[in-house]
C-alpha cells in the first residue's frame, strides 16, 4: 500500500507537498543514515546489520558510497514514509494542543543493537573492533528475579559521549521535545549508574556496576534544549546518589500509588508523605497492572490496609478512589488511565515487562467514553484545583 502511495507521490510531486517534503529532508539530516540502514536491511532479507558483509558492517567508506547509489530509490521510499508519518503526527499533535491536550512521550534509555543509531554511531557504544558488544545492559539478580534481567542492549561509551559534548543525546532530546509536549525519560537511575553484563552471558549474573554521566549530561541537555518538559522515571533502587542527581536535574519524579501501601503508612509514595510538589503521581503505568487488577492480587493484610486508607468497602470502588487521592495530592501533575476510569481489571492490562506475545493489544472502545465518567473527572479536576485557566478569546473589532 505504501509502495503504491510512494509511486504516485514520486510521479506527481508538486506544489505545497513537494516543498514540504524538500524542507523535511533538509531539516532532518539523520534521514540519510536511517534510510540507507532500512534499504540495506531489505536487501539482506531483514537480517541484522551484525550479519551483513564486513565492508558494510564496518561502514567502509567505499561500500557505503556504493550502497547509497545502488539503493537510492529505496532510500527515498523510506524518507517518504518518515515524511508522511511526521506530517500526520504533527497535524494530530496540533489538533490535541488546540483542544487543551498535551502529549507525553517516552524516550528509552538504550538503543537496540540492530538499529541505525548503533550501526552509524558505533564509536558511541561499547563495541569491539568487529562491532560486537563487549557488555550489554540489564539488572542484577534480586528478590524478584533469581537470574536478574538481561536486556541485551549495547551500552553507551560515556567517555566518548562526553568528548563529543553529548552531541548524540542533545540531538535525541531536541527531537523528542518537538515530537511531544513532555518527555518521560525511561530508567532515569541508569544515568547515575548502570549495570554492565559481559556479552554472551545467558543471565544477568557476573555483571558490574559503573558510574554513568550523572548531572554532567543533563546540564548540557538543559543548556542546549531548555529546562522544562521532562519527567524522570526514577522507579527502582533510589540511592542517595540518585536522589542527588534528581535534585540537581530538578525534573519531576514519579510516584506510583501501587507502590504506596506499606501497612506502616511510611511509604514515600503515599500522598501524605510527599516531600515535594515537583512530582507526578500515577494511579498505574503501562508496565503495571490496573489498579483493580493490582488490588485483587494483594494479600489479605495489605488489602485491608488499602481499604482502610482509601475508605472503600468493595474492590469495585478502588479505581475511583485511586483517582481521587491522586487528584487531591500535592503533586504538580496527576495521571490516570482509561482502565481506571472504566474500572477495568487485569484483562485490560497493557504490558507485562520481559514478556512477549500479548502486550500492547488493549484498545479503548467508543462505548468506554461515557458522559458519567467525563462529568466525574471534570468535577474532580475542578474541586482539586487542577483545571487549567481558560484562555480568553480576543473580541473581533
What would you call each of these model-derived segments?
Residues 1-86, 111-335, 339-341, 346, ...:
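Alpha-amylase-like alpha-glycosidases and glucanotransferases acting on alpha-linked glucans and related
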Residues 389-397:
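Short Lys/Arg-rich cationic patches that frequently serve as NLS/NoLS or arginine-rich RNA/DNA-binding motifs
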Amino acid at each position: 500500500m505504501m509502495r503504491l502511495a510512494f509511486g504516485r507521490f514520486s510521479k506527481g510531486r508538486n506544489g505545497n507537498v513537494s516543498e514540504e517534503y524538500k524542507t523535511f529532508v533538509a531539516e532532518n539530516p539523520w534521514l540519510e543514515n536511517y534510510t540507507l540502514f532500512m534499504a540495506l536491511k531489505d536487501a539482506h532479507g531483514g537480517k541484522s546489520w551484525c550479519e551483513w558483509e564486513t565492508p558494510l558492517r564496518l561502514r567502509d567508506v567505499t561500500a557505503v558510497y556504493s550502497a547509497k547509489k545502488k539503493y537510492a530509490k529505496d532510500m527515498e521510499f523510506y524518507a517518504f514514509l518518515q515524511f508522511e508519518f511526521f506530517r500526520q503526527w504533527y497535524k494530530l499533535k496540533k489538533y490535541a494542543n488546540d483542544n487543551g491536550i498535551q502529549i507525553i512521550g517516552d524516550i528509552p534509555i538504550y538503543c537496540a543493537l540492530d538499529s541505525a543509531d548503533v550501526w552509524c554511531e558505533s564509536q558511541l557504544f561499547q563495541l569491539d573492533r568487529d562491532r560486537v558488544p563487549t557488555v550489554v545492559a540489564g539488572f542484577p539478580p534480586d528478590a524478584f528475579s533469581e537470574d536478574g534481567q538481561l536486556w541485551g542492549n549495547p551500552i553507551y561509551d560515556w567517555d566518548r559521549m562526553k568528548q563529543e559534548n553529548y552531541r548524540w543525546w542533545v540531538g535525541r532530546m531536541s527531537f523528542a521535545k518537538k515530537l511531544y509536549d513532555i518527555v518521560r525519560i525511561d530508567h532515569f537511575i541508569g544515568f547515575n549508574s548502570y549495570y554492565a553484563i559481559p556479552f554472551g552471558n545467558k543471565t544477568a549474573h557476573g555483571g558490574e556496576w559503573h558510574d554513568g554521566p550523572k548531572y554532567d549530561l543533563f546540564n548540557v541537555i538543559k543548556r542546549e534544549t531548555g529546562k522544562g518538559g521532562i519527567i524522570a522515571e526514577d522507579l527502582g533502587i533510589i540511592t542517595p546518589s540518585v536522589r542527588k542527581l534528581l535534585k540537581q536535574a530538578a525534573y519531576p519524579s514519579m510516584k506510583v500509588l501501587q507502590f504506596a501501601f506499606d501497612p506502616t503508612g511510611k511509604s514515600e509514595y503515599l500522598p501524605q508523605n510527599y516531600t515535594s510538589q515537583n512530582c507526578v503521581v500515577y494511579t498505574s503505568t503501562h508496565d503495571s497492572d490496573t489498579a483493580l487488577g493490582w488490588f485483587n492480587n494483594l494479600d489479605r493484610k495489605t488489602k485491608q490496609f488499602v481499604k482502610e486508607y482509601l475508605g472503600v468497602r468493595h474492590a469495585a470502588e478502588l479505581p475511583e478512589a485511586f483517582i481521587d487521592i491522586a487528584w487531591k495530592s500535592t503533586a504538580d501533575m496527576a495521571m490516570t488511565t482509561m482502565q481506571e476510569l472504566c474500572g477495568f481489571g487485569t484483562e485490560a492490562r497493557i504490558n507485562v515487562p520481559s514478556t512477549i506475545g500479548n502486550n500492547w493489544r488493549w484498545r479503548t472502545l467508543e462505548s468506554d467514553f461515557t458522559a458519567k465518567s467525563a462529568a466525574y473527572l471534570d468535577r474532580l479536576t475542578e474541586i482539586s484545583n487542577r483545571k487549567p485557566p481558560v484562555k480568553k478569546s480576543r473580541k473581533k473589532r
